[in-house]
């Protein structure tokens, strides 16, 4: 009992000896005031006053101690580890354990936060399984050309010759300029149906797909390819039947779909146009997808450039994702709706329908007819070409930039194909090899080819070719069609592609400007466009009237006979010794005779004569008009034909290829370098350079000697004797005047004018030569190389593709959640157990106790009473009782007969009789002492409090006088304690009961019931509705058990009821 008092003091009494108003109070209650239930263990009872009530039963009676509840009571009652140390006497101990508990609580919170964060992130594990079936369904393969529009269709007669409706207002797709042919195309076709226009402008499968072989070696048919529309253009797909897909039985290159494709790079629109220009590189896109899928764009395909043989291995992955924000689990309705494009339940067409909806909302027209044939339910009109290029393309571009991932989720179960590329060079014998190039003799033999699309075969041969029939990839019909299509495309490129068209136009303009420059400067090859050197020099006064002023001299010079040896000796003799010559003019018959007489003087005279004759001869050629040509006498008809062909090409009357081939004929090819050079350039350059400029330069070189001769007077004498035959003074003066005048004119104005004429002619001819060579020696021959269909053509236009399964296996990818709710609960429970020694059930219990302490008491105030049987079963009755009075029960048989067999062996009827006899032998003195002690319990001030020392003294007295007194007062029966009936309890000392140490006994005191006497029923006050007694507060293995003793008759009724329900229970009320 002392230890129990200490436990009471430890839990309810503060450390300080003096109690203030905030300390918990301990009260004594009358038994009449409240009725309490009894439980065979320590108990904590929640009351309606928000207090904790503890009941202690001793051998002398029952003690009730109550106090205000504290926050730690819930943790203590929930059996959390180390919480009881927070009430330790030492502040150091309390602080240390408080820090430890707080640290562990923080660790628990951190761990719980990390686990909750992990749970919210929804981690997923992906499991990969490999299957090796004997047959695998081959996927759908779609071929998409990066070029969406064919040049030959846009610029062909079907569009350019079409009559469109009148335009009201302005077009959305183009401005008002008419310079670009593609703007003209839009004006010509603005009212056409956009889907029809796009399909006609796309690459045809008959032109793009030249060969196809299934994995089993059989050839494909063009009818096996179906049109597949995407937002980036039209594609051609094979193996599209989802119910009957092609199956392969092996993997590797030998089990692939082999394709020979024509990229048709010559059909690309590289012109500077807003809507038709190809913005991607030349090549193809290969799409590999499941038959149930619908591609929305070709940009995600495998790129195949031209000029290579591509091996494209792929692997299949069956993916099964978890339903969530990334995918949708397809139900039966959605699967059935997969064949209806416009069905909102069709998740496979959601992306395309999103594009179409945006087009319809923005442009008030629809393009659904391209994707589904069932468009009768669409009330909106179809988009025309102007609406497509002016509005629909912009609307689809907005959706492409915004993305559709948030509005259109893919199905969770799908088949993905991962492909890669192996690049190799194309074979050399793809196209027939050219053996001999065709070359016509003259341009008249070259004929134009008919470029109408309805013409099946080419009419012009490009030369003799050779191909091995056993290894030929293309037949003759395909080769001829490719050449014809390429010819037509190259022709359109040359006329409408800015870089080619502008370059050709500028080269033609340059040649025409060179010809115009020659004609402007009167250097042309026609009579009306040519002006000779003499005519040009006649503008000089010193040259124009030279013949009139020196007519007599000119006549003498022109009629001067040839000088003989004798006459030459006489002339030299005259110059050497005029006096001797006058005496005997015929003295010397040869120059040798003169040398024998005059020695070296003969050589000086001979040199002077040679200088005078040379200068006079040169000047004579310079001043004589007959020295220059007056008209061009060559055949320049071919040059005129060249200009005519050039004009025809500019007027679109001559094809570029025909023009180039005509210019490459034998006669045309070498005309400019041979005939034109000899008949035009050589005569003019002779007059200007040889006759005029060079002669004047040579005269200037020898003129210093002539000037020396003039100064000493021998020049006039020599000239007079050489040209006039008489060396008199007049002849001398005429000659000197003539040679000086001719030199002054030639070295002055004539020389300057001759330099200008020569420079002008050379410049004009060089420009003509450069322009002619650039156009006819470079541009057109390069253009003709396209029609050789050799390695350059093959590398620019062809590609080979082999699509095959990399390994004969399937990868099945499935996703599972790796961290669910139960994993979170287990981790949080583990963290609680590791750091706090608690569990989730402990947390729930703490919450429950907190609610019980704070809320249940308030609810209990509204209850009138709780039957005693409910309290006995530790249950709280929610419904209130109208009356707690119960009828008197019948006497029951001895309890030992209702107990188990072991109980009956320990307790018999003799034991009950012996107890009755013992109770009747109580002494009066001891009864008085007990009355004095227990009188304190009957104090009218039942709520008076006791100090801890008073409680200790009181408990010591109770222990010494544990038997309660007997009261017999018939006048005040309401003040009797219901347990003061001396006939009810029998107290046996421990020494008389050897069975006290038996199994199941918890104390040296026990209560032995006997059959109750017949008594009248008495009224009982209502029992307050209290909480069930919790077995959780004061447990001590060495302390006596705690009992709560009710009145005998109520105890008998309750024990009988409990015995009937469970014979193994030892606690009763």
Curated annotation (Swiss-Prot):
Q: What is this protein called?
A: Degenerin-like protein del-10
Bilayer disposition of the protein: Multi-pass membrane protein
Q: Name one GO biological process term.
A: sodium ion transmembrane transport
This protein's major location comes to membrane
Give the molecular function GO annotations.
Answer: ligand-gated sodium channel activity
Where in the sequence does UniProt note compositional bias of the Basic and acidic residues kind? Answer: 915-928, 967-978
Q: Where is this region: Disordered?
A: 898-948, 960-1069
Please give the GO cellular component terms listed in this UniProt entry: plasma membrane
Q: Which gene codes for it? A: del-10
């Amino acid at each position: 009992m002392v230890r129990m008092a200490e436990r009471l003091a430890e839990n309810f009494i503060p450390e300080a000896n003096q109690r203030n108003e905030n300390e918990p109070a301990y009260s004594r209650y009358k038994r009449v005031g409240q009725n309490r239930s009894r439980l065979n263990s320590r108990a904590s009872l929640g009351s309606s006053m928000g207090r904790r009530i503890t009941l202690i039963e001793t051998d002398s009676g029952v003690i009730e101690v109550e106090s205000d509840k504290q926050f730690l009571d819930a943790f203590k009652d929930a059996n959390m580890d180390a919480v009881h140390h927070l009430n330790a006497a030492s502040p150091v101990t309390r602080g240390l354990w408080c820090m430890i508990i707080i640290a562990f609580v923080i660790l628990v919170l951190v761990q719980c936060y990390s686990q909750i964060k992990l749970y919210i992130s929804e981690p997923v594990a992906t499991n990969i399984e490999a299957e090796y079936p004997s047959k695998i369904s081959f996927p759908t393969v779609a071929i998409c050309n990066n070029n969406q529009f064919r040049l030959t269709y846009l610029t062909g007669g079907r569009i350019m010759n079409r009559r469109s409706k009148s335009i009201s207002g302005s077009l959305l797709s183009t401005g008002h300029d008419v310079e670009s042919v593609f703007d003209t195309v839009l004006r010509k076709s603005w009212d056409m149906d956009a889907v029809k226009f796009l399909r006609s402008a796309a690459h045809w499968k008959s032109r793009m797909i030249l060969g196809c072989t299934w994995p089993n070696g059989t050839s494909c048919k063009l009818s096996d390819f179906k049109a597949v529309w995407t937002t980036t253009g039209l594609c051609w797909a094979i193996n599209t039947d989802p119910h009957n897909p092609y199956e392969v039985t092996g993997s590797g290159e030998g089990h692939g779909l082999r394709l020979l494709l024509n990229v048709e790079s010559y059909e690309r629109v590289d012109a500077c146009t807003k809507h038709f220009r190809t913005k991607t590189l030349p090549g193809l896109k290969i799409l590999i997808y499941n038959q149930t899928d619908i591609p929305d764009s070709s940009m995600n395909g495998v790129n195949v450039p031209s000029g290579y043989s591509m091996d494209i291995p792929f692997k299949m992955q069956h993916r099964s994702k978890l339903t969530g924000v990334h995918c949708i689990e397809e139900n039966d309705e959605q699967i059935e709706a997969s064949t209806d494009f416009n069905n909102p339940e069709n998740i496979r067409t959601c992306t395309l329908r999103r594009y179409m909806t945006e087009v319809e909302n923005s442009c008030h027209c629809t393009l659904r007819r391209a994707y589904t044939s069932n468009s009768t339910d669409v009330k909106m009109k179809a988009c025309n070409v102007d609406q497509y290029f002016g509005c629909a393309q912009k609307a689809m571009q907005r959706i492409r930039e915004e993305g559709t991932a948030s509005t259109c989720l893919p199905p969770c179960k799908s088949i993905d194909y991962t492909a890669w590329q192996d690049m190799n060079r194309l074979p050399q014998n793809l196209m027939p090899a050219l053996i001999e190039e065709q070359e016509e003799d003259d341009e008249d033999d070259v004929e134009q080819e008919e470029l109408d699309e309805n013409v099946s075969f080419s009419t012009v041969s490009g030369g003799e070719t050779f191909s091995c029939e056993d290894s030929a990839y293309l037949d003759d019909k395909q080769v001829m069609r490719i050449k014809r299509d390429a010819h037509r495309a190259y022709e359109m490129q040359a006329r409408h592609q800015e870089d080619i068209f502008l370059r050709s136009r500028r080269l033609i303009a340059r040649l025409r400007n060179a010809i115009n420059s020659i004609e402007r400067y009167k250097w042309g090859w026609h009579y009306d466009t040519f002006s000779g050197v003499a005519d040009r020099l006649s503008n000089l006064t010193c040259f124009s009237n030279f013949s009139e002023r020196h007519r007599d001299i000119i006549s003498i010079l022109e009629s001067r006979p040839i000088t003989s040896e004798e006459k030459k000796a006489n002339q030299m003799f005259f110059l050497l010794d005029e006096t001797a010559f006058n005496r005997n003019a015929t003295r010397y018959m040869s120059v040798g005779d003169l040398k024998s007489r005059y020695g070296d003087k003969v050589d000086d005279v001979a040199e002077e004569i040679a200088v005078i004759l040379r200068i006079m001869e040169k000047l004579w050629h310079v001043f004589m008009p007959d020295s220059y040509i007056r008209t061009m006498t060559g055949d320049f008809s071919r040059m005129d034909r060249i200009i005519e062909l050039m004009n025809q090409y500019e007027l679109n009357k001559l094809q570029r290829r025909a023009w180039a081939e005509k210019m490459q004929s034998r006669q045309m090819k070498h005309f400019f370098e041979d005939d034109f050079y000899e008949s035009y350039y050589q005569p003019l350059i002779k007059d200007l350079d040889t006759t005029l400029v060079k002669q004047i330069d040579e005269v200037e070189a020898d003129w210093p000697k002539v000037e020396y001769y003039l100064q000493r007077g021998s020049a006039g004498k020599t000239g007079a004797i050489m040209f006039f035959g008489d060396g008199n003074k007049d002849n001398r003066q005429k000659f000197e005047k003539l040679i000086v005048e001719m030199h002054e004119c030639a070295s002055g104005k004539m020389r300057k004018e001759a330099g200008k004429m020569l420079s002008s002619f050379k410049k004009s001819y060089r420009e003509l030569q450069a322009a002619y060579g650039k156009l006819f020696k470079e541009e057109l021959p390069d253009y003709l190389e396209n029609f050789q269909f050799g390695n350059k053509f093959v590398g620019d236009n062809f590609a080979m593709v082999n699509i095959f399964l990399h390994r004969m296996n399937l990868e099945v990818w499935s996703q599972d959640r790796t961290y669910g709710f139960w994993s979170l609960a287990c981790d949080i429970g583990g963290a609680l157990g590791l750091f706090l020694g608690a569990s989730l059930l402990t947390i729930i219990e703490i919450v429950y106790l907190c609610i019980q302490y704070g809320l249940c008491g308030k609810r209990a105030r509204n209850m009138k009473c709780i039957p005693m049987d409910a309290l006995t079963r530790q249950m709280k009755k929610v419904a209130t009782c109208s009356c707690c009075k119960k009828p008197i029960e019948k006497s029951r048989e001895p309890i030992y007969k209702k107990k188990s067999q072991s109980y009956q062996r320990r307790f018999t009827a003799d034991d009950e009789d012996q107890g009755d006899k013992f109770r009747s032998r109580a002494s009066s003195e001891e009864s008085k002492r007990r009355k004095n002690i227990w009188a304190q319990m009957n104090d009218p001030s039942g709520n008076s409090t006791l100090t801890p020392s008073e409680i200790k003294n009181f408990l010591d007295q109770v222990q010494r006088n544990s038997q309660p007194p007997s009261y017999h007062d018939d006048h005040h029966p309401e003040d009797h304690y219901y347990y003061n009936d001396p006939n009810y309890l029998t107290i046996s000392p421990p020494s008389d009961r050897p069975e006290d140490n038996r199994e199941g006994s918890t104390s040296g005191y026990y209560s032995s019931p006997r059959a109750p006497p017949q008594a009248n029923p008495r009224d009982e006050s209502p029992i307050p509705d209290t909480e069930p007694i919790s077995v959780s507060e004061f447990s001590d293995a060495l302390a006596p058990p705690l009992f709560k003793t009710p009145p005998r008759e109520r105890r008998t009724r309750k024990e009988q009821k409990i015995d009937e329900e469970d014979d193994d229970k030892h606690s009763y009320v």
